Design a protein with these regions (language model features):
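HKD-type phospholipase D/PLD-like phosphodiesterase module
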Residues: 1-37, 48-57, 64-200
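Short alpha-helical functional segments enriched in proximate histidine and acidic residues
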Residues: 45
Length: 200
């Protein structure tokens, strides 16, 4: 786990060499840097989200006016430590803005949460995020990125697992990024019936 001084600007660690946390770049700090770079959109397709630091970065993106769409596995919405419902409620925090406008957040699941189908279906096991892809390839910019890998957005992944996280960016990678973007949009349309309700 990285020291707070690596994550929070202007925070000074007073423990010095006695600090038990990492003072070097980690998968988590790398992921947070990418999320914090978002200017227009975050399209997140994630099996599980239980790492508060990541959820906080997504919430901060919403406050900056970034449009956020999340697709997740219905079985994990209410799993121990899940941040999905809390993030979903941020969609109601932007009074006067609908999802179709430039900011806000919406969560869709691969099945209705709590249904029999939810308990017996295969998992939606993706772990990728598209940054500043906008509505399509014509909107790609120098800040457009794809994050993908085995890295779950969980405390377990941050503290214990051996995982990988790859980031693709730049025009040379736009074809691969576009493949993931199209896949995300297909799932987004497919799961339209399973929008996670708010205020529950």
């Amino acid at each position: 786990m990285p020291c707070k001084s690596i994550i929070v600007p202007n925070f000074v660690c007073r423990r010095g060499e006695q600090c038990e946390f990492s003072h070097k770049q980690t998968n988590l700090t790398f992921l947070l840097d990418c999320l914090n770079s978002a200017e227009k959109s975050l399209d997140i397709c994630i099996f599980q989200l239980t790492c508060n630091e990541i959820a906080q970065a997504v919430g901060e993106a919403v406050k900056r006016g970034v449009r956020v769409r999340i697709i997740t596995d219905a079985n994990n919405v209410d799993s121990n430590g899940s941040d999905i419902r809390e993030l979903n409620e941020l969609g109601t925090a932007n009074k006067g803005f609908t999802y179709n406008q430039k900011r806000g957040i919406q969560v869709r699941c691969d099945e209705r949460v709590g249904s029999q189908e939810c308990r017996t279906k295969p998992h939606m096991h993706h772990k990728f995020c598209l940054i500043d892809c906008g509505l399509g390839r014509k909107d790609y910019t120098g800040n457009t990125k794809l994050m993908n890998g085995s890295f779950n957005w969980t405390r377990q992944a941050v503290l214990e697992n051996q995982d990988n996280l790859m980031v693709l960016e730049g025009a040379v990678n736009f074809p691969m990024i576009n493949t993931y973007h199209q896949s995300f949009n297909m799932m987004w349309a497919k799961y339209e019936r399973f929008v996670l309700p708010r205020g529950m």
